[in-house]
């Protein structure tokens, strides 16, 4: 989609009715590909005459009002198109019917169906299935509301773009200046902007006076950019004669012609790109889907098997259908949906305390799966404040303190040359501290002025005391501000220092320009002639500091002779009447936006965690490379192609790119790369820096990483980052410096803008994945002792050992707090020392977990329950062998003389009291064996002795489930409400040996696992 080609080319071809969905899909893909292309704009290359012909605009009088109206009618208002939004009710329904909820809904529907069948075929149907259906529905609705509340976020991306649109613009129509509503600005309009204005559309500058714009939201460059009518670069994003919609004019004035409006502006394209990107499923959503498939598979397999078996055993088909439904429902872990949601919420809260605000619960785990981080440079890896890093004076480079708390090195300040240099930096400087900040640390104070001048001001204030007092001592008489032609700034001050002349001229600017204006230099406080040796020394220092990616400024002064410039002399800065040549060079000062203190350590942690960190920035390659080396993205000893060429003293073209582990890629190189070349680059280089990238390229880089199978996290703060943030598996925006747009596009916000907080997030994400596995293993284990009574009831025709209501008391009662308590479990080992999990092989729930939970521990638990059941019935006279086949008579309410093993007769009422006592005891047995299960689930590899019992919530969970079980058993009225009967104290102890057996069995399994890593036991049982 080329820009600046006139409206009609953008009219979308109407798709014919029968073209159908294929055409629409193909068209959407084509539009998307067009948006991803670089800005195609040639207006910056046109002369003023050509512009006049193209847009029909009079370059002094502007458009006529009637012509402007025509264009407005043709093109529509200068406003961004809002994206299609998802209604809130649809979002709510997604929470209610998405993923795991669907399984529970199916369970609920089957329960109602079973109850319906029973109600139709029996006189007095049992209400168990009805209760179960109601409870399942309630669980889904409550959890859905909770999740919706947690994620009540709408895709407000475009709304925040609306905040970028300036309300009013100063246009020139019919030769008159008029305030026009920004939405009415049209193609070809002549517009004026001044300092403080927001640019109303993409403009081609035709005249400017000291105009600087802040393009940081668009390109990521923190330095203000000069704007003038000069065509300075082939790239429209870097040329001086174009200013972009919604960027800010900081100072000066400019006049320009509107070359693009609304969605066709560069910012509009980014907006459209961000809002039309589809985010994929989160890794945890994929895991839960996989888990549902496993559980459903097991449930349907068991259900169908026993359905067929019950028909073979002679049950009628209605009974068989009820059994089928019962088995499928019994397999559904009712409490797991709530457990997973609560676990993720707890982690989200824990992350918020560590400055990571999670907008989307599932993103909590995504960060833990991350294998590649594409990080922005400015403000994320760096402090987002220009700081003086080095000075060169007395023919020596001195290092300044760039740390955030001024705990670094300090340089020798005793030299008279430093006194001269600091005086120039303080006086030839228009930056000032804002009022009432005397009690705020110098580095944290707000400054009015540009970033470089603010850096100099803070440096001098730190090193030499109050700059204000210095300026009062040397009052300013005249000044020539910095401009792009001269490349210097100059001011003249009254000088009250004894032994010096009455006027002092100070100048700063581009080092080579300043040196050209000097014929002497200050060394150790003494003036010497500027010879070739000193010029070479200057050149070496300049190259060295420039090579560190620093912005270097030169400083010089001149004591104006009193005989020519007496007190009261009228200095004229237009017709310059004072010397600007043959001055005295004093030194250099170099500034950089320094890395944050915690970042190198964080990057190191990422590396040991197997996470690749890629820097993607709009800044210059040299600066980007310097910061990348400073923070360890390019590690010590790793060379780029350019480094190898320099070391071997050969041309870059002769070096094999595969020999270089690191590489710095310029946006212009990336522009010419095919997808295959980009894939090759990402595959074969471990350390990569992309510099001078455009927003579209950021998106292409993210897609490239995803093609490699990486789970990608992207950090960003500008509007330019929003497409990449949206496309990434997890977008991380900056809370302080971030634009509204980037925060809306992201899944997570760093409240302190610090890259190190991401590493904390990765750690929490990995931990919650491990702990969710433990939680699920714990919850699923009790499924077997819950299902097996039902299966034996069908096959062996014994009285039902465990009722539906009792199962609910386990799943939604006693098991809930212990399962959630596992979310608080600490890591077993250093989780940041292992590789990121492979989403294809390392699943949340795998066959081994099912085998342990169902096949091993679950079976032991079921045995414990049946042991208790048979003990109680035997105590009451029914020996195990006599129970087989007794079910039909047992459940017949008209049989009141059923004989036990000793010939005693039992009425229906008395039999049922014994049966319900068995249900209660079976329930208590499950609680007791779940003690051991909870303790063994604390760890997947370590011994419990190593892991310790420091998780207080888990200990509380053990007491809570026991207390709840006792309450349900002994509370008066429970026999009526839940059919729970008081138990003899001895019955509690039936399951104790099994609980101990489970504990010892799993300790032995983990001991073998630790002794033989990679052995048979690990392959078969390590989940």
From Swiss-Prot:
Q: What InterPro entries is this protein classified in?
A: ATPase_P-typ_cation-transptr_C, ATPase_P-typ_cation-transptr_N, ATPase_P-typ_cyto_dom_N, ATPase_P-typ_P_site, ATPase_P-typ_TM_dom_sf, ATPase_P-typ_transduc_dom_A_sf, Cation_transp_ATPase_P-type, HAD-like_sf
| Domain of life assignment | Eukaryota
Q: Per UniProt, what is the membrane topology?
A: Multi-pass membrane protein
What are the residue ranges of the propeptide? Answer: 1-5
Q: Does the keyword Lyase apply?
A: no
Q: What catalytic activity does the UniProt entry give for this protein?
A: K(+)(out) + Na(+)(in) + ATP + H2O = K(+)(in) + Na(+)(out) + ADP + phosphate + H(+)
The stretches that face the Extracellular side, renumbered to this chain, are 109-131, 309-320, 793-802, 867-918, 971-985
Q: What does this protein do?
A: This is the catalytic component of the active enzyme, which catalyzes the hydrolysis of ATP coupled with the exchange of sodium and potassium ions across the plasma membrane. This action creates the electrochemical gradient of sodium and potassium ions, providing the energy for active transport of various nutrients.
Please state what the protein is called: Sodium/potassium-transporting ATPase subunit alpha-1
From which organism does this entry originate? Oreochromis mossambicus
Gene name?
atp1a1
